Amino acid sequence: MRQALLTRFLRYIKIDTQSKASNTRSPSSDSQLEFAVILKQELEQLGFERVELSHLGYLTASVPKTVDGVPCIGFIAHLDTAPDFCGANITPQIIENYDGEDILLGDSDLLSTEQFPSLLNYVGQTLITTDGTTLLGGDDKAGIAEIITALAHLIEHPEIPHGEIRLCFTPDEEIGRGAGHFDVPGFGAQWAYTIDGGELGELEYENFNAATAVIRAKGNNCHPGTAYGVMVNAQTMAARFHAKMPLQDTPEGSKDYDGFFHLVNMQGQTEEAELTYLIRDFDIDIFEQRKRWLTERVNSYNADLVVGSLEIEITDSYFNMKEQIIPHPHVVDIAKEAITSQGITPLVKPIRGGTDGARLSYMALPCPNIFTGGHNFHGKHEYICVESMEKAAGVILAICSLTCEKYLNR
């Protein structure tokens, strides 16, 4: 499977499929649909059944069951890559038998073991890195390659017992819309796994509760030469508001189960300005407290103003999937056993973000997240270990087999 997996991955990352948050249609970029068409043709050639591509960019397919009495399960990955950094003209570097030293990325950057000590876990293995000018696209082209390679193996070996296996490749996960048009009843799986995690062994079934707060400052513009006592600069209002936000309650000041406020965008002019904050926390009660606290800060700020005002609008994005996974412990237990079967210790950790699986779990499709083998997603220091990708494909196969064993032996 190694060569097929590597060939697929290197072919997929050459296709720029960055999503575009400014575009409200689905998919948000034409390239995602073009990539889905390519994958559809590949799945048909490999012998997958019920291969369907919706006009909204959702590609689904099936591996038919070889035995009866086993639940239908699914595997999910996303077509888009992050818009955070350049995703076009990707030129990967393949480092075989990695020696544990710093890796030069092209001519101008470095993947250093001091900054990224996880590199030392892969001495003697094969790494794929960027050339320092783009992201790599392992999030989530690696997941797509691993799912197709693993399930193609099942098609090639019909003697392996398993129930029906479904796959779905979704658009626009990176901009929070991946589950927006997901047809859960049509998908037909009792549970599923996103193959969208990071380092070897990761298994995630907790994620942030997430909301976005948009704070709009309303000022008063006039000619600066006659501004005395008249002008109210909305940008100054916004800057002063942010200056009093807690300094350590940020992404760079938090870890593990800490939540945060993240100023992700600020823009404006004298008349109007806008601050956009991401609100994140694992604990639903603290999450709600954060939203109330930010609203109260805006109200308090307004109370001290003579002219001008702030307005706040908060929109929930997704919630912690743990609440929906706990009632279905077998979904996690099978994944843990599958990871262990590949000689890996499961690395159970919370997702300091979200996945399609978080929203799908609230749509009656329990959906934990499993590793792809990649590190440092969304930037030029992204890299992935080929051996870890092989292990991910092995975990997918093991999940299919273990599900079959557990239900046939009841």
From Swiss-Prot:
PROSITE patterns, sorted: ARGE_DAPE_CPG2_1
Cofactor: binding comment: Binds 2 Zn(2+) ions per subunit.
Cofactors that this protein relies on: Zn(2+)
Residues where Zn(2+) 1 binds: 78, 139, 196
Active-site feature positions: 80, 173 (proton acceptor)
Keyword Signal appears in the UniProt entry: no
Gene Ontology biological process terms, A to Z: peptide catabolic process; proteolysis
One Pfam match: Peptidase_M20
Top-level enzyme category: hydrolase
Membrane-spanning segments: none
Sequence positions that bind Zn(2+) 2: 139, 174, 378
Any one GO cellular component localisation term in the record: cytosol
Free-text function comment from the UniProt entry: Cleaves the N-terminal amino acid of tripeptides.
Name used for this protein in its record: Peptidase T
Species this protein is from: Shewanella woodyi (strain ATCC 51908 / MS32)
Gene that encodes it: pepT
